[in-house]
Each structure stands twice: as structure tokens, then as C-alpha cells.
């Protein structure tokens, strides 16, 4: 949904800024947390009344929401996330992960993208761009 889309957008912005700011000596990092013990499920209290909806509230009461809430409640502590951020910044990491156990999921995504690129490289429609060098790399 919208929450996941905004997280993906932040990663894309970070990657773009990293490329744009590298020549100026500015490093950019993005925090990619999984389940952290936060009060995210209490955030509805901050939504202005004109934007509140019974549909949103009822969707949050579903089984997906209760399972996700349990995972957040059992997530890592915010203080550990903060220490991990400092550690990663000191090491110059661009992507700051809190849950390395998500690696197989990310590898699967990267492999799917790689396979799609390999197929595109074989397309007769794209042969004129296959060997073009990209200035951004």
C-alpha cells in the first residue's frame, strides 16, 4: 500500500541524491528497518479529523494488522536501531539495515530484476541500446 510505496520512494530518492552529491563529498544513507518497537499503531491519533475514515480503521483491525502489530511489538528496540545507524554511518554504509535476515527476500528481488535485464538484452527491439555506456555509472 501507500506505506510501502513511500518507503520505496525514500530509497529511490536516497540513491538519486547519492549519485548527485558524491562529487561534492556528501554521503547519503537510508535507514531500511523492518519491525521496530514503535507506536506506529497509535499514529491514527495524529491524523486530522477531516482525514479520518472508518474504512481505514476497520482495515487496521483485520488479521493482517494484528499480525503486523504483534511483529512490531516483538521487534527490536528503538535504541538498538539508533546504535545501528551510528555504526553504519561510521562505516560509510549507504543502506542501513536492521534485519539482516531479510537478505534472501532482497536477493530474490535482485535476481528477478537481473533476469528481466538479461531478457531485455536479448530483445531485438533493444539491440541499439544494449552496448551504450551509461554516464551515470
For each feature predicted by the language model, list its residue ranges.
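Active-site helix of classical SDR
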Residues: 6
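Hydrophobic alpha-helix immediately C-terminal to the catalytic Tyr-X-X-X-Lys motif of short-chain
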Residues: 9, 13-21, 31
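Non-catalytic terminal and boundary segments that flank Rossmann-like NAD(P)-dependent oxidoreductase
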Residues: 115-137
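Glycine-rich loops and low-complexity Gly/Arg-rich segments
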Residues: 10-14, 53-57, 120-124
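Terminal hydrophobic/aromatic helix or amphipathic segment near a protein terminus
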Residues: 95-111, 115
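SDR active-site lid
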Residues: 23-100
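Catalytic tyrosine of NAD(P)H-dependent dehydrogenase/reductases that use a Tyr as the general acid/base
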Residues: 3
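Charged, glycine-enriched surface loops/patches
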Residues: 63-64, 108, 120
Amino acid at each position: 500500500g501507500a506505506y510501502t510505496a513511500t518507503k520505496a520512494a525514500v530509497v529511490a530518492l536516497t540513491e538519486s541524491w547519492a549519485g548527485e552529491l558524491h562529487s561534492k563529498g556528501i554521503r547519503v544513507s537510508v535507514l531500511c528497518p523492518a519491525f521496530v518497537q514503535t507506536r506506529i499503531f497509535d499514529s491514527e491519533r495524529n491524523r486530522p479529523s477531516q482525514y479520518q475514515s472508518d474504512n481505514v480503521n476497520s482495515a487496521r483491525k483485520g488479521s493482517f494488522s494484528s499480525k503486523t502489530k504483534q511483529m512490531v511489538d516483538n521487534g527490536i528496540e528503538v535504541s538498538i536501531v539508533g546504535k545501528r545507524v551510528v555504526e553504519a554511518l561510521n562505516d560509510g554504509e549507504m543502506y542501513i539495515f536492521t534485519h539482516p535476515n531479510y537478505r534472501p527476500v532482497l536477493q530474490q528481488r535482485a535476481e528477478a530484476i537481473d533476469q528481466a535485464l538479461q531478457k531485455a538484452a536479448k530483445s531485438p527491439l533493444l539491440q541499439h541500446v544494449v552496448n551504450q555506456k551509461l554516464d551515470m555509472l
